[in-house]
């Protein structure tokens, strides 16, 4: 931890003023080094009051996706987020983790912006600087491939729970994994799997999550403006990205523990409650082209695939790699 981070940590732990002498003594720094650290923190956007005879007091922190800011809100986790790296810019947080040979289970990476963010079906994911949470987590579950299809759905439930904890509003889930608010997409989730060439065993999973936090309508490209939203648009106020990121890491840690334990009953119940498609007539749009079909979404099965009832009254299961689901009149409705 740098001297700047050490000073910040002590200031966070005090409700009132902390003298320069106390900071110097507790950190083993000179008074000049303490002043230099405070000056550097102010340069990063921290509002620090200084009073003669009293010392320093932290008044406000900037909305920065730094390790220090995220960890200031983060409770201890078992696996997810114990290793955390934060960057100003990456081409893709998923790409970074896929290239990290030997990265530990649960390692997490964030970026203030991405130049080549991606969503499902290799679609572009817009990642403007300072407006969202762009997070990827590396998982090494050591499970057979047939135990892993629920991962993305579990991440969707984790996002909904984290947003509810921090913002007081719970998103719904458009099958299979899009958190939505007011009928518009709030978040994108992409899971990528790496297999061992010789054995076909799962080497790792990279789970990428992008949450729209501070975007205004004009910040979205015209082609996604009608289907995308942000927490700012829904709530009418700014949300702390570090605080929400910390809550998300905690919820992902719980979901990962449930996956490893093989007990997903609570997550299936939450997913069924959150899924905005259940009980509604939807459009099934085949990937790769083909005729659209209208059916009624009636259930979610053990692997979080969608059970639909066609016009002939027969029920069947559709999987996320086969079709995209839309409402009759819009993204969800």
PLM features: residue spans?
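Short, ordered beta-strand-loop transition motifs
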Residues: 50-52, 174, 300-301
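Long, positively charged amphipathic alpha-helical accessory segments at protein N-termini or as interdomain linkers
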Residues: 1-30, 39, 43-44, 143-171, ...
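A short coil-to-beta-strand element that immediately follows conserved catalytic motifs
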Residues: 107, 170-174
């Amino acid at each position: 931890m740098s001297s700047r981070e050490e000073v910040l940590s002590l200031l966070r732990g005090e409700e009132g003023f902390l003298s320069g002498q106390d900071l110097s003594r507790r950190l083993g720094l000179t008074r000049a080094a303490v002043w230099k650290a405070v000056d550097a923190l102010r340069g990063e956007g921290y509002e620090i009051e200084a009073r003669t005879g009293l010392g320093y007091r932290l008044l406000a922190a900037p909305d920065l996706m730094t390790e220090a800011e995220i960890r200031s809100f983060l409770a201890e986790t078992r696996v997810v987020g114990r290793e955390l790296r934060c960057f100003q810019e990456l081409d893709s947080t998923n790409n970074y983790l896929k290239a990290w040979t030997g990265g530990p289970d649960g390692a997490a990476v964030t970026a203030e912006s991405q130049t080549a963010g991606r969503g499902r079906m290799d679609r572009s994911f817009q990642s403007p600087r300072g407006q969202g949470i762009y997070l990827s987590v590396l998982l090494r579950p050591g499970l057979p491939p047939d135990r892993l299809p629920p991962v993305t759905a579990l991440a969707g439930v984790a996002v909904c729970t984290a947003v509810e904890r921090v913002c007081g509003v719970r998103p719904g889930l458009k099958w299979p994994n899009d958190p939505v608010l007011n009928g518009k997409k709030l978040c994108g989730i992409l899971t990528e799997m790496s297999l061992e060439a010789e054995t076909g065993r799962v080497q790792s999973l990279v789970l990428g999550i992008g949450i729209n936090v501070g975007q205004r309508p004009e910040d979205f490209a015209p082609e996604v403006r009608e289907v995308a939203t942000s927490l700012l648009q829904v709530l009418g106020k700014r949300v702390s990205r570090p605080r929400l990121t910390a809550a998300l890491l905690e919820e992902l840690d719980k979901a990962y523990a449930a996956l490893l334990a093989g007990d997903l009953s609570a997550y299936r119940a939450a997913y069924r409650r959150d899924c905005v498609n259940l009980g509604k007539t939807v459009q099934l749009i085949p990937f790769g082209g083909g005729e659209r079909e209208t059916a009624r979404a009636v259930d979610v099965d053990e692997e979080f695939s969608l059970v639909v009832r066609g016009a002939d009254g027969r029920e069947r299961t559709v999987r996320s790699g086969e079709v995209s689901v839309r409402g009759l009149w819009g993204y969800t409705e």
